Amino acid sequence: MIISMWALYAIIAAVLWGVDYALTERALQTIRFPMLLSIELFFGFLTMLGIAIFSGSYKTDLAGLFSSNRAIALVVAIVVAFNIANMFIVLSIGDKNATLSGLIEISYPLFIALFSWLFFKENNLSAGAILGGIFVLTGVSLIYFSNK
């Protein structure tokens, strides 16, 4: 069986998020979250800017972005949500630990489904996905209440 690229990308992302969260827990013993996030985001900016310039996509993307008020609004909302979410997960890791914070955060796909429906009227849920979501919520509740 050959794995689809989208699934491989998601697995790689999950592994790297695991590395990031474990390292974040240790880094927060030395530095505070604003500095850690500033460093992460600064180098992320440089990396992505380099990729955009090298691939040549920046010209097309900037033209597309600034030709649409909707695109600008979406990007602003994404930047706000991304930065606030990063701040809260790092605060959670610092307050408890990377393992429990990550296990609670794993519920975010439920919110993807909710907001995709609320914002765009998209419904990508199957019976299996709904059942899986119920298991996720049950697991999150079990983790939270057994680790207060």
Task: Locate each region found by the language model.
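Hydrophobic/small/kink-forming positions within alpha-helical transmembrane segments
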Residues: 18, 22, 49, 79-84, ...
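Juxtamembrane helix-start motifs in multi-pass secondary transporters
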Residues: 36-37, 101
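Membrane-interface interhelical linkers
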Residues: 1-12, 29-34, 42-76, 83-95, ...
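C-terminal transmembrane-helix exit sites in multi-pass transporters
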Residues: 110-130
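N-terminal signal-anchor/start-transfer transmembrane helix
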Residues: 12-27
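Small-residue-mediated transmembrane helix hinge/kink sites in multi-pass secondary transporters
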Residues: 25, 90, 116-117
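Structural signature of transmembrane alpha-helices in multi-pass secondary transporters
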Residues: 13, 78, 105-108
